[in-house]
Amino acid sequence: MGGVHPDSTETQSLLGQAQTGDRQAFDELFGRHRDALRRAVELRLDARLRARVDPSDVVQETQLEAFQRLPDYLERRPMPFRLWLRKTAYERLLKVRRHHLKTARRAAGREVALPHESSLLLAEQLLAGGPTPSQHAAKHEVARQLRTALGELSEGQREVLLMRNFEGLSYQEVGYVLDIDPAAARKRYGRALLQLRQRLLAGGFRESEL
């Protein structure tokens, strides 16, 4: 996870065709990233949004927006295509959140919990060692506390955690998506992990368990 992988020769070829207005070439290229984008969206939909938003709809809207913005992207080429799609999907999801949770945020504050599955996956990564029986039982308690602690993080901190731990992005790649320097992404990730660990320790977990 140390750097940025450039676009493949095949991707560049399809982008060249799409630049001439070949919608089929763009759709073929987007299709290669569809599953990854859907997974990224699913990881970020909490219970309030899941009842209202279909991840496939967000991905479809991302595809339409990306095609409309493709000429600008091809003119500037600010980042590899897959990261640009990831950034476009992230921005689309933020718009969906603002639209659907505007009233909920006013009523319940700014906390946004990750889906339970995301909390469990992060709990597995934070627990030291292998999946012993005690750790298996503790995982769900960690996940419960993580859901609360993650809701207290800033949006940017949560995103860095997801991009690093679930999507395997490097700090430079995270920086592209979030429009921050790689060094800032590294610091943000470190602060987020520290805050989560402090919360778990305050909740009764031992340092050796984390």
Task: State the predicted function of each range.
Residues 72, 87-112, 116, 124, ...:
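Arg/Lys-rich amphipathic alpha helix in sigma70-family domain 2
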Residues 2, 116-148:
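Acidic, proline/glycine-rich intrinsically disordered inter-domain spacer in sigma factors
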Residues 2, 115, 120-121, 176-177, ...:
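C-terminal edge and immediately downstream basic/flexible tail or linker adjoining helix-turn-helix-like DNA-binding
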Residues 57-64, 79-91:
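Structural recognition of an alpha-helix C-terminal capping motif at a helix-to-coil junction
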Residues 9, 15, 148-159, 163, ...:
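Helix-turn-helix DNA-binding module
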Residues 8-14, 30-31, 50-71, 167:
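Conserved RNAP core-binding helix
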Residues 30-53, 68-72, 150, 195, ...:
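Amphipathic, Lys/Arg- and hydrophobic-enriched alpha-helical face
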Residues 18, 37, 41, 58-66, ...:
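Short, small-hydrophobic-rich alpha-helical interface motif
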